Amino acid sequence: MAAGADVPCAVLALLVLGSLAAGGDATAGFIKSPLSQRRLTQDSVELHCEAVGSPIPEIQWWFEGNEPNETSAQLWDGAWQDRVQINATYNLHSTSTIYIANLTSDDSGTYECRASNDPDRNHLSKSPKVKWIRSQANVLVIERPVITGQYSSSADKVVLSCNISAPPTLIKGHKWMLGDKVLKTDESDASSYISYTIEGKVEDHSGVYECIYNTNPVAKGNVSIEVEPQVVAYKKSEHGNEGDVGVLTCKSPSYPPVDHWAWYKSGQTVPLESSAGIYNISRTGNKTELRILKLNIEQDMGDYSCNGTNMKGSGSATVNLRVRSRLAALWPFLGIVAEVLVLVTIIFIYEKRRKPDEVLDDDDGGSAPLKSNATNHKDKNVRQRNAN
């Protein structure tokens, strides 16, 4: 039915836009109407309306409660103790969205979107020539059901459970979520009692878990696992050069978030504080960072402790800081130079010792050809005698 209802709206929009292109006037008409909805108390609701016309029509929102003698009243941005917000735009056509927060049962009733482009639509004494067009949506606010959530834990397992009483409609499944992550989905279970098992220690799985029942409207409960901060160091050991900036980081993934962070140097009971030219400490939620602006090899080297505290207790971690002298970076280069010098010296000594041996070898090589020549002469004489 929604698709069929959109067809006349689309046709009307084309007719009005065609009239606008031709430069003529056109009475106001809806191209989107608000839809009826069901909500639970403490939830919020949003209704949307769009209209076309020439000139561009004005849109207003009106409300009439379910009480027998209640009359219709216009809604304004900021009404009902600032629970009502209305956003409207007037460009090629009119759009308006009304948002109502923290619903109560008194908010049930008929919400009406009105549109008109008659010049006299808001005149106090003159009646408009064209009546306001109207589109209505019913909002039913149902009392929120009671959902009891709890957990139990052992050495290696955590069991979450929820139980709903007086669901608004039949239950058609459920799911478990942690933040934006879906942990488990069951679309066939119609039970009011549901559970979810987590393998591991309770300290490693803190947070706010949601149990969501597939009813109309959707009913949500939560199970909160709260532990003391499980503080860990980003690196257990950090290195820095003298004169540079040293950065030590700690974090806690636990829930509730850390309320207070403190840094201590080994052997000191007074926490470090940010001071110009020495320390800069940042604390952002579950993360803290200690910056030592100019590392000193004598004063800054050692162990540092980061301590986090929340409503459940406190936790800490230790980071070891090692500071190197600026000359430390030259040692590898000096080592290479020393190796090259030793190698050159060895080659030089070897060459010096090898030269006398080469001279002796040259003398022996000069006498050898003489013996060879004498032998050749003897061979020639022997061949001559044989020839004779």
From Swiss-Prot:
InterPro entries: Ig-like_dom, Ig-like_dom_sf, Ig-like_fold, Ig_sub, Ig_sub2. Coiled coil: none annotated. One of its GO terms (cellular component) is plasma membrane. The keyword Transmembrane helix applies. This is Basigin. Residues 229-323 form the Ig-like V-type domain. The keyword Magnesium does not apply. GO terms for biological process: angiogenesis; axon guidance; dendrite self-avoidance; endothelial tube morphogenesis; homophilic cell adhesion via plasma membrane adhesion molecules; neural retina development; neutrophil chemotaxis; photoreceptor cell maintenance. It comes from Gallus gallus. Residues 345-388 are cytoplasmic. The gene is BSG. Residues 43-131 form the Ig-like domain.
